[in-house]
A protein has these predicted regions:
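Short, acidic, metal-binding catalytic loop of nucleotide-sugar glycosyltransferases
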Residues: 81-94, 102-104, 422-430
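Short, well-formed alpha-helical segments that are part of the catalytic scaffolds
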Residues: 72-85, 412-425
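Active-site-proximal specificity loops/subdomain of glycosyltransferases
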Residues: 101-171, 436-494
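Catalytic core and acceptor-binding pocket of nucleotide-sugar-dependent glycosyltransferases
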Residues: 239-335, 520, 535, 542-680
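GT-A fold catalytic core of metal-dependent nucleotide-sugar glycosyltransferases
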Residues: 167-175, 180-210, 220-222, 480-537, ...
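A conserved hydrophobic helix/loop-capping motif in glycosyltransferases and polysaccharide synthases
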Residues: 63-72, 404-409
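N-terminal signal-anchor transmembrane helix specifying type II single-pass membrane topology
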Residues: 1-46
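C-terminal, non-catalytic tails of nucleotide-sugar-dependent glycosyltransferases
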Residues: 305, 334-382
Length: 680
C-alpha cells in the first residue's frame, strides 16, 4: 500500500472512530440455530473448560518468539536488537522471523492476476531482499532461529493467524510486530507470570488466554468507563487483546484458530454490536485486521488477558508507530489510534527500576481484579453451594436491601442466555441465578454472574432429613421447588426484600425501574384475583416479597405444608378444584391462598394480580407475531413480560422466529450476545 493509500485509510478509520464516540484513552494510573442439548453445552461452555479445569504440569516451559515483519528494515533491526539483548537466564528460546511477501503495486490493484513477473529492480522486491539478507545474517545466541518468507502476501490478519500452532501445552508464543521495542527484562517477567498463573494450581484459571506487556490503550465498547485500575497490585485482567508484545497461552489459541477457520469457511463476519471493531470492518484496513476476529472470540468464550500496572512513564514494551508496515502502520486495534493518539513518553524499565517498583511481586489470583470490554469490574466465581456462600453473594448484588432472584431451574440454556443478554440491554446486572447443577449454569459463574446451585447438598442443608421420604419419582421437580422456597426464606432471614422472576419470562422493559419504588405502597386487590386464571403467571412472571416477620412465618408454614403433602398421596385441601395438582405452580397457588386467608398483610405482591391496570401487560409466546411481516403491524412496546411457557415442546425455529420478529432475540448463531452494552 502506498503512502497516499495509507493516509486515506487512516483518515477514514479515524473519522469513523471519532464519530462513533468510543472511549479511547492513553493509559494513566494512579441464521439458523442448532439447539439440541449437546450443541448447547458445546456452544455455551468452552471445550477447554469442560475437558480440564486444572493447571498443566510444569514440565518444560518453552517460549517461541514470533516477529512479524514486512517492509521496515530499521524497525526490524531495532526490534531484533532489543530481543537479542534481553535477559533469558540461560533458557533456550526459539526465534521465528515471519516476513510477509512483497507484491507489486500493480498486482495489488489487480487481484485477478495469479502469476506475477517479478523484477529485481522494483523497490518492493529490493526492500524484501534487503530485509531477508539482514535476518539471514542476524545472530541469535539464545536458541534456534528460523526465517519464514511468505510465498503470498498475507497481511497482518494472515501473519497473526498463521504465526503459530502450539505443539503442546507447555509451549507459549510471544508475538511482536517489527515496530515494537522490548525491555531487557521482558522474558524474565513473562516467565514469572506464567510460572505463577499457569503452573501453580491455586492461581490457574482456564479463562486466561495470555499476558500483554503494554498498557491498555482502548475501551472498545461505546459508553465504556475510563481506563482506571483500582487495585494495589501490579497485575489486572482485561478482556481486550494487546499486540505491543503479546504472550499467548496454547489452549485458548488453539480454540481460536479452529473457531476462526470455521467462521471463515462459512463466510461469517466478526460483528459485535456496540464495539468499535465494527467500524474498522468498514474501512480500507478492515479486511487486513485480525483483532475484530479475536475480540469476537474472546467475547464468545468469556476469556481475559493479564496486564501489568506500571507508572505512566514506564513500560516493558514500546510501540514506535513507524510508517509503513503490513496493512498500514501496525496491527494493534487500528492505525488511527497510532497516528492520532498522544502516546506517553515511555521508557523501558531497567533492572534497578524493576527492583524499586516490585515488578516481580505476583499476587494470588483471587486478589487480582477483572475488567470486561466496558472496563467494568467483573466479579468472577460467585457461586454458592451453601447458605454461608449465599450470604456472601447477596452482599455483592443487593441494591437498597433488595435482591433480584432469577429461577433458571429446568430452563433451556439458550433461553437463559437470551434472557441474560436482554437484561444487559436493560442495564440490569445485579441479580442471582438459581440453577440446577449443570456445566452451563456453573460456567455462568465463571463469566461473572452470581449463581446459586440448587443441589442435593443444599437441599440437605436447607430441608434436613425431612426430604428423604419424598417419592423418588417426584423428588427432583418438587425438591427444586422446595429449595427455591427455602433459598428465598434464607434471603428474607438475612434482611433482604426479594424480587423473584423466571429466566423464561422475557422483560420488555426494566420493571425494577418502573415498579421498584411503588411496591411497598401496593396492596393485593383480593376482589380482583381470579383463581381460575392461568396459573403459570403466578410464578413465571414476577413476584415481589417484602421483608417482614409475617412473611417469614408464612413462608416457613408453606414449606412445611408442602413437605407433608409431598410425603403422602392425599390431595391438598387448600387447592380444591383449581386447575393445578402438583409441582412448582402449586407452590405459588398455595402461597397465594394462604396469604388471602390470613388477616395480616404478609407483604405478598404479585404483579400478575394487577392485570386489570392498563400500565401492566403480560402475554405469552403465541401472542407474539409469527414473522417480521406481521410484526410490522404489531408492537410489544406496551407489554411488560412475555412468558415463554412450553418452549421445550415447540420447534426452536418457531420460537426464535417469533422472538426475532418482536425484537426480543438477543443472541447470535453461537448463542452469544449480539451487542455489548456499557450502561451503568
Amino acid at each position: 500500500m502506498g503512502a497516499r493509500g495509507w493516509f486515506i485509510g487512516v483518515a477514514a478509520a479515524l473519522l469513523l472512530f471519532v464519530m462513533t464516540g468510543y472511549h479511547m484513552v492513553i493509559c494513566r494510573f494512579p441464521g439458523t440455530h442448532k439447539l439440541e442439548a449437546d450443541n448447547i453445552s458445546r456452544l455455551l461452555v468452552p471445550s477447554s473448560l469442560s475437558s480440564s479445569s486444572s493447571a498443566a504440569k510444569p514440565q518444560k516451559f518453552g517460549m517461541v518468539i514470533k516477529v512479524l515483519a514486512f517492509n521496515r528494515l530499521e524497525s526490524l533491526i531495532r526490534c531484533l536488537t532489543s530481543l537479542a539483548n534481553a535477559d533469558y537466564g540461560g533458557d533456550t528460546v526459539k526465534l521465528h522471523i515471519l516476513v510477509d511477501h512483497f507484491r507489486f503495486e500493480s498486482s495489488e490493484l489487480d487481484p485477478s492476476t495469479e502469476e506475477e513477473e517479478e523484477d529485481d529492480s522494483t523497490p518492493e522486491e529490493g526492500g524484501a531482499h534487503e530485509i531477508l539478507m539482514y535476518v539471514d545474517g542476524f545472530k541469535w545466541q539464545h536458541g534456534p532461529k528460523e526465517v519464514h518468507y511468505r510465498s503470498k502476501k498475507l497481511g497482518l490478519q494472515g501473519q497473526w493467524i498463521e504465526a503459530w500452532w502450539p505443539s503442546n501445552d507447555d509451549e507459549f508464543a510471544f508475538i511482536v510486530e517489527d515496530d515494537v521495542e522490548l525491555s531487557r527484562l521482558f522474558y524474565r517477567y513473562l516467565r514469572g507470570v506464567v510460572s505463577t498463573y499457569y503452573y501453580k494450581p491455586q492461581n490457574y484459571d482456564p479463562s486466561i488466554y495470555g499476558v500483554s506487556l503494554q498498557c491498555p490503550q482502548l475501551v472498545p465498547s461505546k459508553g465504556g468507563l475510563p481506563l482506571v485500575v483500582n487495585a494495589t497490585g501490579n497485575l489486572f485482567l482485561y478482556q481486550m487483546v494487546g499486540t505491543w508484545g503479546q504472550l499467548l497461552f496454547p489452549r485458548p489459541w488453539k480454540e481460536f484458530r479452529i473457531w476462526y477457520d470455521k467462521c471463515k469457511s462459512k463466510d461469517m463476519r466478526p460483528f459485535l454490536g456496540g464495539m468499535v471493531t465494527n467500524t474498522w470492518n468498514n474501512t480500507q484496513l478492515g479486511e487486513q485486521m485480525w483483532t475484530p476476529w479475536f475480540v469476537k472470540f474472546i467475547h464468545l468464550r468469556g476469556y481475559f488477558n493479564l496486564y501489568t500496572k506500571l507508572q505512566s512513564d514506564q513500560a516493558l514494551s514500546i510501540l514506535h508507530r513507524d510508517h509503513g508496515g503490513d496493512g498500514g502502520g501496525g496491527g494493534h486495534v487500528n492505525a488511527s489510534i497510532k497516528s492520532a493518539a498522544a502516546e506517553p513518553n515511555l521508557k523501558l524499565i531497567s533492572v534497578d527500576e524493576a527492583i524499586n517498583i516490585s515488578l516481580w511481586e505476583m499476587e494470588p489470583l483471587k486478589l487480582i481484579k477483572w475488567y470486561d470490554f466496558c472496563f467494568r469490574e467483573v466479579k468472577v466465581g460467585r457461586i454458592a453451594n451453601t447458605v454461608a456462600e449465599l450470604s456472601g453473594i447477596l452482599r455483592l448484588v443487593e441494591v437498597n436491601k433488595t435482591v433480584l432472584m432469577v429461577n433458571a431451574v429446568h430452563v433451556q440454556g439458550w433461553v437463559v442466555q437470551n434472557w441474560l443478554c436482554q437484561m444487559q440491554s436493560l442495564g440490569l446486572r445485579n441479580f442471582v441465578l438459581l440453577g440446577d447443577d449443570r456445566p452451563f449454569v456453573r460456567d455462568l459463574a465463571r463469566r461473572g454472574h452470581a449463581v446459586v446451585i440448587l443441589s442435593a447438598a443444599l437441599s440437605t442443608e436447607l430441608l434436613g432429613q425431612e426430604i428423604s421420604g419424598i417419592d423418588i419419582m417426584r423428588e427432583d421437580d418438587l425438591r427444586q421447588d422446595l429449595i427455591t422456597m427455602q433459598v428465598v426464606d434464607a434471603v428474607l432471614h438475612l434482611g433482604y426484600r426479594v424480587w423473584l422472576t423466571r429466566a423464561d419470562a422475557m422483560w420488555v422493559h426494566n420493571l425494577l425501574s418502573l415498579f421498584g419504588n411503588k411496591m411497598e405502597q401496593l396492596k393485593v386487590d383480593v376482589a380482583g384475583i381470579e383463581l381460575t386464571r392461568d396459573h403459570h403467571r403466578f410464578h413465571r412472571s414476577l413476584l415481589y416479597i417484602s421483608n417482614s416477620n409475617a412473611t417469614v412465618h408464612l413462608w416457613g408454614k408453606l414449606v412445611k405444608d408442602f413437605l407433608e403433602a409431598a410425603k403422602s398421596d392425599a390431595p391438598d385441601p387448600d387447592l380444591g378444584q383449581l386447575p393445578i395438582m402438583q409441582g412448582e405452580s402449586a407452590l405459588w397457588w398455595k402461597f397465594l391462598l394462604m396469604s388471602l386467608k390470613s388477616e395480616a398483610d404478609f407483604g405478598y405482591r404479585d404483579l400478575s394480580t394487577m392485570l386489570v391496570q392498563p400500565d401492566l401487560m403480560i402475554i405469552g409466546l403465541d401472542d407474539l407475531p409469527p414473522n417480521r411481516r406481521v410484526a410490522m403491524n404489531t408492537s410489544v412496546t406496551n407489554t411488560h413480560i412475555v412468558l415463554l411457557d412450553g418452549v421445550a415442546r415447540r420447534k426452536p425455529s418457531d420460537v426464535i422466529q417469533r422472538l426475532n420478529a418482536a425484537g426480543l432475540w438477543f443472541i447470535d448463531k453461537e448463542l452469544s450476545c449480539k451487542h455489548i452494552h456499557c450502561q451503568p
